[in-house]
Design a protein with these regions (language model features):
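Bacterial N-terminal signal peptides that target proteins for export
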Residues: 1-5
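Bacterial N-terminal signal peptides
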Residues: 6-16
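Residue-level hotspots at or immediately adjacent to binding/recognition sites across diverse folds
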Residues: 22-344
Length: 344
């Protein structure tokens, strides 16, 4: 018995030491040139070869060869629009969202790889400002989020793969807090997983809203990231309907990542403060090759977690706004036409 106890104690000391001697290898971003000066906050990686980006001056580009070449597939007449979200199903079907008050908020959809676009939605309410959108699995139903109108966040929905959109009644939406709004920073302020949808807020309050019925009714939950005029939750990512992570902070204090993340293991019913980041982060996503690994990006660099958001490590200092992970890699996009793929 004495030898057994000694052996157990030795193992308890050796195993952690071995784990520390071989920590997970940090990845790195490999830039891929796009030939564009626009800032790409809209991003959707379909797979390791196909990705779409939306730019700050009405440009949409697509690659089908892993970023070696890019096609300009911008909708006609889109110059001057600010695209902040791209949601693509494949190399042919994609929707892009432009932001702004009134008719500046638009959604275009293509079914032929960008050769032709349908003007699927034009916001006709000057009080509305659409920030982000997402589609449920399969791509038939999608939701788009506007900042509050008449004291409540507004949701538009599509049931025909993005071809047309309609504003949903607000009777199932909780009241917004004064000054509360969403951040159109990376197209991930509204996300879906399974039959569930969530969106995140900041400004007057830092909260998440959760729907289980296609966006008709929502419940609001306080988030652990502090709220302020330029602070709150900027990005959400859910691996499944239970496990989610949030990142954000204050974009006027880009090097401050204290209390800038959180995680949930119960579908957003409760959130726990995550580990500190190395700065404000505008985008986050789950890495496909590890169930507890996520990457977060922002203007001062990137961080990675190997424990589901409990702790984070910096691994790159390049500026990126959005991140989208696909099997085998992740895509990132940002200022001055920046696009990169994650390598190990």
């Amino acid at each position: 018995m004495g030898r057994f106890v000694v052996l157990v104690l030795l193992l308890a000391l050796v195993v952690p030491a071995a784990a520390q001697a071989h920590p997970p290898r940090l990845p790195k971003w490999k830039p891929v040139p796009t030939g564009s000066p626009q800032q790409y906050r809209g991003l959707d990686g379909v797979n390791a070869r196909v990705a779409w980006v939306g730019g700050s001056a009405g440009e949409v580009r697509k690659t089908v060869d892993g970023g070696r070449s890019w096609q300009d597939v911008s909708p006609p007449g889109s110059a001057g629009l600010v695209f902040r979200d791209v949601e693509a199903e494949n190399a042919f079907k994609a929707s892009v969202l432009s932001i702004g008050e009134g008719p500046a908020s638009k959604i275009y959809t293509t079914f032929d790889g960008g050769r032709n676009w349908v003007t699927a939605f034009v916001n006709d309410d000057p009080r509305a400002f659409y920030d982000c959108m997402d589609f449920y699995a399969g791509g038939k139903r999608g939701l788009a989020l506007s900042d509050p109108v008449d004291g409540r966040f507004r949701i538009a929905a599509t049931d025909d793969w993005g071809r047309s959109w309609h504003v949903l009644p607000n009777t199932g939406m909780p009241d917004a807090v004064a000054g509360e709004f969403a951040f159109a920073a990376s197209g991930t302020c509204l996300v879906t997983s399974g039959r569930d949808a969530w969106f995140a807020t900041g400004g007057g309050a830092s909260r998440t809203f959760h729907s289980r019925d296609g966006g008709l009714t929502w419940t609001a939950t306080a988030a652990p990231i502090p709220a302020a005029e330029a602070a709150g939750v900027f990005s959400l990512a859910f691996r499944n309907p239970r496990d989610g992570v949030m990142v954000g902070g204050d974009f006027t204090a880009p090097t401050n990542g204290v209390r800038a993340s959180g995680f949930t293991r119960d579908g957003g019913a409760t959130w726990t403060q995550g580990g500190d980041l190395t700065g404000y982060r505008s985008g986050v996503d789950w890495v496909s090759f590890s169930p507890a690994t996520l990457v977060a990006v922002g203007p001062t660099g990137s961080d990675i977690t190997f424990d589901g958001g409990r702790s984070w490590k910096p691994f790159d200092t390049a500026a990126y706004d959005a991140v989208d992970c696909v099997p085998l890699t992740c895509w990132a996009s940002g200022p001055a036409g920046a696009v990169a793929v994650l390598t190990r």
